[in-house]
A protein has these predicted regions:
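Bacterial N-terminal signal peptides
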Residues: 2-17
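Active-site histidine-acidic residue metal-binding/catalytic motifs
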Residues: 25, 97, 144, 256, ...
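Short, solvent-exposed loop/turn and secondary-structure capping segments
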Residues: 48-51, 55-58, 98-100, 109, ...
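Primarily short, surface-exposed interaction patches in extracytoplasmic proteins
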Residues: 161-196, 200-235, 250-297, 361, ...
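Aromatic, loop-rich ligand-recognition surfaces of beta-strand-rich domains
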Residues: 428-627, 692-697
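Globin-like tetrapyrrole-binding proteins
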Residues: 956
């Protein structure tokens, strides 16, 4: 406890002090971000433009502050005295607001209270998305994002500072500030800038040596050279590729109930990273992800790009019901439509699946025209290899497969002839004294025999005529002979049991649910999963005279009950006994029992009808087959990647009325969206157009230079990741319910520049990073915040918390353990356990195999990723064009006590000893340089030395790895 208090006091007193202004700004309630969306979502239905109950409107500043028929409802500075707060917290049915539906959450109530207590700041004119008093539907003739891009040259404001006059970006941002009476912030200091730049472009901190060199380099071109160096680094593609993977809803498990892992999707991740590093033109990047198999046939590095189409959640459970199968397929294609329209066009086309889009001019027919373009896409793995590799592989494999096919054909012909004779003999001579085996109950009597051991050899199951593996067996009973007969196969009477199992104890959360001990536990319902060898051995505490066994799969089932879902059960077997556990003799077998099916009937009589020549020939052929199969297996297979398979649609595409696949509407063919008909030529294909042509036509239409959405959407994403919020704050929705651009002229200027640069992103990055706008300090200024609380107009650089991956990578780098190996299969921060469903169990130890960058972690859906989920790692059940950046006590508690933190704290101590020697002051200074890229202040140095004296070096390094300054970017 003393250690924890010591570290907490040291961190609270020192490390947060340098961050206070940024942290407070992060926690400030912002009207546009926090309050307007809340009022629109929860209040404007009754108090908006269409309805204003009680003469109260909460969608307009003046009318909201004025109040309604009963007076003001918002008392700035006094939430406790505000009628609005009283109503939303009331439990009286006649007063509570909203009157029906879900109540406001504690978080929403807290936002409202804090906003009112802070003065209920409601900017007179703000840039926002749809409000309740605007038209309820966008018109394609007037909606801003559907209009052609403007190519105007930004004017130079008369009073602009000289440093801001040289860049079009700066001129446009300055004009927006000046219009609100705001001034930009001064430039950040050089240490802040280099740290900001490294995280922006690479997601990693600079080394102390890189910081010192840049701070000392006063050459005017030093900043440009640094920007260019980082844009050329491999880590740039890892950082910006990670952003795109969020947009692409990339996850390496299928989601849904089973959530099985996908082990060969990493090729798409590597393709994305490689594309960013190579500065692949964005239009080419789009086309390859939709039709890489078409435009890059025979080029694996291009073909693999279609992983975009199938990297989303996929319901692989299957269903016997035809109607349900159609629903699952409709949902699967809907994911493709959603991902494509969101990522590349910034449109929510998926909202037109069941009816015309409620807000954007997208008719239902257009949704299904887009569906027709994707109807041939299936979620599956496929070979991705060069034509040369395919030819070489075929040349080696072809002759062997041909020989194997010939051998197999001869074996099948011979076996068929023998089986036919065996079946005739079985039907003629077969006499059975016992009924066929069942799931529910099977008894087998034999002559009384003395035994201390009994062995039950499973020779066949209900679905395997020659193997006992995978059978399920519940209670197994061994009964003594005589009148006072008793079951001695019980753990309670001292019997012990051994046998194979297909599941290990560590493979099952909570223990070995499938263990062999279940056959002697005296309870029904849980079954032993038989493995190999398929045998059960019982040992009794003393010699016994026995004369029968009883076994079943599930004795609770009624006779005749269909229970195929329970798997296979025992049908053929042998019973052996022993008095010493060494010498065994057979006392009974299933030959007396009626065969379970025709295949097992044939199996029993094969030996009697097979001639010596036939047996010899079969053995020779089977040996030849085994040899050929061994040779075939020795040839390395062509690489399989989860990149989708493409098949020609079996039937036309129809509109689903109300989104129901059972309610067919009119037939549609692949075509473009009418929403952009006025801006660029559309495409319309035949309903019988080849599958590949459909996706390629769509891709080329999306990247047509006249398309006003594609370039706008992508440059807005760049702006979003550079500044924390896009010019449009809804990066994947440029429709009516999305945000409006704060700087529309700047958005169009950037989009035009992207096309002028040949759709390459790095030149645009460079222009943004060289701008004075990006290089501003992040210090909070109260007078500016009153006008623009979230700095949407960019009067300062918006500070932010590091993303989850950046947090982990930073800790590893500071400790000196980050492994920068790139590409290939990912690592796991969990143990993967697969039964019918998948389970992901967090690791309790972290070693070199987990020290790679987090972008290479095999992220799965619907699972808590240890150390990352707490910092808002998205689940990717859907796309994550924006990430939450929460700040919570749980993050601090988890981070402070996490096994990785503890391990790296010790590793960092060792690093400091190696790099700074035995001098305590030198080691403290080195620690601060590694963690924060700055030396400690005198007070920090003194406090650190006291902490070390009281609690040791690991206390200091643990504190540094949990400090605000490490996790926040200014």
């Amino acid at each position: 406890l003393a250690l924890i208090l010591g570290i907490a006091l040291w961190m609270g007193g020192l490390l947060t002090s340098g961050w206070r202004s940024g942290a407070e700004a992060q926690g400030r309630v912002d009207f546009e971000r926090d309050i307007r969306p809340l009022l629109l979502a929860r209040c404007s239905g009754c108090h908006g433009a269409e309805r204003s109950k009680g003469e109260l409107r909460l969608d307009q500043r003046e009318r909201a502050l004025r109040g309604g028929a009963s007076g003001p409802v918002i008392m700035p500075g006094d939430s406790a005295g505000s009628e609005l707060i009283r109503r939303v917290t009331s439990r009286e049915s006649t007063e509570q607001m909203p009157p029906t539906g879900e109540r406001l959450s504690e978080r929403e109530l807290g936002l409202l209270r804090n906003w009112i207590d802070a003065g209920a700041n409601w900017p007179a004119e703000t840039v926002s998305g749809a409000t309740a008093n605007e038209p309820r539907r966008a018109e394609k003739s007037t909606w801003w994002s559907l209009q052609p891009m403007r190519a105007a040259i930004p004017p130079t404001p008369a009073d602009i500072p000289a440093a801001w006059a040289g860049s079009a970006i700066d001129r446009l941002v300055y004009a927006g500030l000046a219009a609100k009476g705001l001034q930009p912030s001064p430039p950040a200091d050089r240490r802040t800038l280099i740290r900001r730049l490294f995280y922006d472009l690479t997601g990693l901190p600079p080394t102390p040596e890189e910081v010192s060199a840049f701070v000392a380099d006063r050459d005017p071109g030093a900043w440009e050279r640094l920007v260019d160096r980082l844009l050329a680094s491999p880590q740039y593609g890892e950082q910006w590729g990670r952003h795109w993977l969020d947009v692409a809803r990339f996850g390496e498990s299928k989601g849904f109930e089973q959530n099985h892992i996908i082990n060969n999707l990493w090729g798409y991740r590597d393709y994305v990273i490689r594309s960013f590093n190579e500065d692949k033109p964005y239009d080419r990047f789009v086309v390859e992800q939709l039709a890489g198999d078409v435009v890059g046939a025979g080029e694996p590095e291009v073909e693999i790009a279609t992983g975009f189409l199938v990297c989303g959640p996929y319901d692989s459970v299957g269903n016997q019901d035809e109607a349900q199968q159609k629903v699952i397929r409709a949902n699967t294609v809907d994911d493709l439509i959603t991902a494509t329209s969101n990522a590349f066009l910034g449109l929510t086309v998926n909202c037109a699946r069941c009816h015309h889009h409620k807000f954007d001019p997208i008719p239902t027919e257009d949704y299904y025209r887009l569906r027709a373009a994707f109807d041939g896409v299936t979620h599956a793995e496929r070979v991705v290899a060069t034509a040369e590799a395919r030819a070489t592989h075929a040349a080696r494999l072809g002759p062997l497969e041909a020989r194997r096919k010939s051998v197999v054909a001869e074996i099948e012909t011979l076996e068929k002839a023998i089986s036919s004779r065996a079946l005739k003999l079985a039907n003629r001579e077969g006499r059975w004294s016992l009924p066929r085996a069942t799931r529910q109950f099977n008894e087998h009597r034999f002559a009384p025999v003395r035994a201390t051991h009994l062995r039950f050899l499973i020779r066949a199951t209900s679905d395997r005529p020659r193997s006992g593996e995978n059978a399920r067996l519940d209670e197994f009973e061994v009964w003594t002979a005589g009148e006072a007969t008793r079951n001695i196969a019980l753990a309670a009477t001292g019997a012990t049991v051994s046998g194979s199992t297909t599941r290990r104890a560590e493979d099952v959360v909570g223990g070995n649910t499938y263990g062999v001990e279940l056959v002697t536990d005296g309870r029904f319902g849980e079954r032993w999963f038989v493995g190999s060898p398929a045998a059960l051995t019982l040992r009794f505490p003393r010699p016994e005279i026995i004369d029968r066994i009883v076994f079943s799969q599930d004795r609770t089932l009624e006779p005749g009950t269909e229970a195929s879902h329970l798997g296979s059960f025992v049908t053929e077997y042998e019973i052996e006994v022993s008095e010493d556990g060494q010498s065994w003799r057979r006392v009974a077998d299933s030959q007396a029992r009626e065969p379970f099916n025709e295949a097992q009937k044939i199996e029993r009589f094969l030996a009697r009808v097979t001639t010596a020549d036939e047996a010899t020939r079969l053995e020779t052929l089977r040996a030849g087959r085994r040899e050929l199969e061994g040779e075939i297996k020795s040839i390395p297979p062509l690489p399989l990647h989860w990149a989708g398979k493409f098949v020609e649609p079996k039937e036309p595409t129809y509109v689903h009325r109300g989104g129901d696949p059972q309610r067919r509407g009119s037939e549609v063919a692949p075509a473009s969206l009418a929403i952009l008909d006025g801006a660029l030529p559309g495409f319309a294909l035949s309903a019988r157009a080849p599958e590949a042509e459909r996706r390629l036509a769509l891709a080329r239409w999306i990247v047509d230079e006249r398309n006003p959405l594609t370039a706008r959407v992508m440059v807005n994403r760049l702006w979003h990741y550079h500044f924390g919020t896009g010019i449009v704050d809804t990066p994947s929705d440029f429709g009516f319910l999305g945000g409006r651009p704060t700087h529309p002229e700047l958005l169009d200027w950037l989009a035009n520049r992207l096309r002028e640069h040949g759709w390459r992103l790095k030149p645009l990055h460079r222009e943004i990073l060289l701008s004075q706008t990006w290089q501003q300090a992040s210090d909070h200024r109260e007078e500016a915040a009153r006008v623009d609380g979230s700095s949407r107009l960019l009067w300062r650089f918006p500070p932010r918390r590091l993303d989850a991956e950046e947090v982990r990578d930073t800790m590893l780098q500071v400790a000196g353990r980050l492994d920068l190996r790139a590409g290939g299969p990912g690592f796991r921060l969990y143990r993967y356990l697969e039964d019918n469903v998948a389970t992901y169990v967090p690791l309790d130890h972290h070693g070199p195999e987990t020290w790679r960058r987090a972008v290479y972690h095999q992220n799965t859906r619907a699972s808590l990723i240890d150390g990352l989920t707490d910092f808002d790692l998205p689940d990717n059940a859907s796309a994550a064009p924006t990430r939450a950046r929460t700040i919570s006590p749980l993050q601090s508690l988890t981070q402070f006590n996490h096994q990785l933190t503890l391990e790296l704290a010790s590793v960092l101590v060792e690093r400091l000893e190696r790099e700074a020697g035995a001098d305590d002051e030198a080691r403290v200074k080195r620690a601060f340089q590694l963690a924060f890229q700055r030396p400690p202040t005198a007070s920090e140095l003194a406090a650190a030395r006291r902490l070390i004296e009281e609690h040791g070096w690991r206390a200091l390094t643990r504190a540094l790895l949990n400090a605000n300054e490490l996790f926040f970017l200014r």
